[in-house]
Amino acid sequence: MSETHLSNQKFADFSLQTEIKTALNESGFEYCTPIQALSLPILLQKKDIAGQAQTGTGKTLAFLVATFNHLLTTPIPEGRQLNQPRAIIMAPTRELAIQIAKDADLLAKHTGLKVGIVYGGESYEVQRKVLDKGVDILIGTTGRIIDYVRQGIINVSAIQAVVLDEADRMFDLGFIKDIRFLFRRMPDAKSRLNMLFSATLSMKVQELAYDHMNEPEKVEIAPNEKTSKNIKEEIFYPSMDEKMRLLLTLLEEDWPDKAIVFSNTKHSCEKLWSWLEGDGHRVGLLTGDVPQKKRIRILELFTEGKLDVLVATDVAARGLHISDVSHVYNYDLPDDCEDYVHRIGRTGRAGKKGVSVSFACEEYALNLPAIEEYINHTIPVTNYDSEALLDDIPAPVRVHRKHNSRPQGRSGSGGKPRSGNRNAPRRHDKTRRHS
């Protein structure tokens, strides 16, 4: 979580428990973001909300503060058993669940409340041992939560607070039946604090809210501004032959500290990885085929700055919660307009500036009109000089090579780094962009 100064509302002005205020202060949080300033007054009155907010707006901190405060100010259910958590936070992806849990740990340290996390792809027994000790706040993906519920390892009949994060993504991934399964086994909606957050409050999301919540109040943040003003957007029209050279040239020119390159298919991502690796970049690959432990390790290296570029499909697009991403490159324009918003939302977060670069090639240029209509603005076109593109590009690494999750490229293995570190001399000193 990162501090932002996007409103004049201070956390200190809310009637929060001292333990929470102390944790917020220690973590450097003083001012609220708009979603926090709007939602917390409602939630602290123990009223439900359905919030529309993009990732990077501070919604995670909003619902975590509300959840912790609710548990600290609400009596523990009489006869509560060790296998009965008091709050449950459901997320669509493992990466998002992991990030929420990290943020929850910051708030939990003075409260005495125990946080547990469960998700697929990791040891069932290791996670079960944590649950056997009892948790107050359970964070996880619905599939793994249901596994434990069906086996009696978790009982949700004492739940006092529920969070459903990125509800629209839940629909996209087909998790709604799982969610309804869990809701039916919880106490009545009127006896819980219910929170739903979604990038879009579509009719199907609102229906879910009203079916399983207690007259939630709708909270919307800039509904007509689907992309952040902190993100500088630009689009290029490369030929298929020049597309890869243009990307490598722009990466050389921009020299981003932390960049994500999105492509529409696993095959294309693997191709991108092989060229970037061969060109000496420290690059990680995230697709649906990457094993869970490796995914976590790659994200850790990227977060720590030991990888500079992450190549990803949309499987990872909405689950990535990484601070300080300076650039997003849409190597392919997405087929789904919402995916464009979610992709570029990885940068320009927490009040910081970001850059989004998109390629409208022959194959995907037809997606652009729908995207621009959806985001309510035209993306500025940037021209480039074909003759100025890099031509001394090393051959790509063979795709079948095992993708190491250790740091690569400019400071280590894989490809030939230009001089072994981030201070390697660049291959040009003039811009390739032309207005």
Curated annotation (Swiss-Prot):
Keywords: ATP-binding, Cytoplasm, Helicase, Hydrolase, Nucleotide-binding, RNA-binding
Domain Helicase C-terminal, chain residue ranges per copy: 243-390
Any one GO MF annotation of this record: ATP binding
Species name: Shewanella sediminis (strain HAW-EB3)
UniProt key word Electron transport: no
InterPro entries on file: DEAD/DEAH_box_helicase_dom, DEAD_box_RNA_helicase, Helicase_ATP-bd, Helicase_C-like, P-loop_NTPase, RNA-helicase_DEAD-box_CS, RNA_helicase_ATP-dep_RhlB, RNA_helicase_DEAD_Q_motif
Residues involved in ATP binding: 53-60
Enzyme Commission number(s) from the entry: 3.6.4.13
Region Disordered, residue ranges: 395-435
Short motif (Q motif): ranges: 9-37
Start-end of Basic residues biased regions: 424-435
Residue ranges annotated as motif DEAD box: 165-168
Cysteine pairings via disulfide bonds: none
GO cellular component term, pick one: cytosol
Keyword ATP-binding applies: yes
Protein known as: ATP-dependent RNA helicase RhlB
Catalysis: reaction(s): ATP + H2O = ADP + phosphate + H(+)
Pfam families in alphabetical order: DEAD, Helicase_C
A GO BP annotation: RNA catabolic process
Domain Helicase ATP-binding: from-to ranges: 40-219
Subunit-level organization: Component of the RNA degradosome, which is a multiprotein complex involved in RNA processing and mRNA degradation.
Subcellular location: Cytoplasm
Free-text function comment from the UniProt entry: DEAD-box RNA helicase involved in RNA degradation. Has RNA-dependent ATPase activity and unwinds double-stranded RNA.
Protein family per UniProt: Belongs to the DEAD box helicase family. RhlB subfamily.
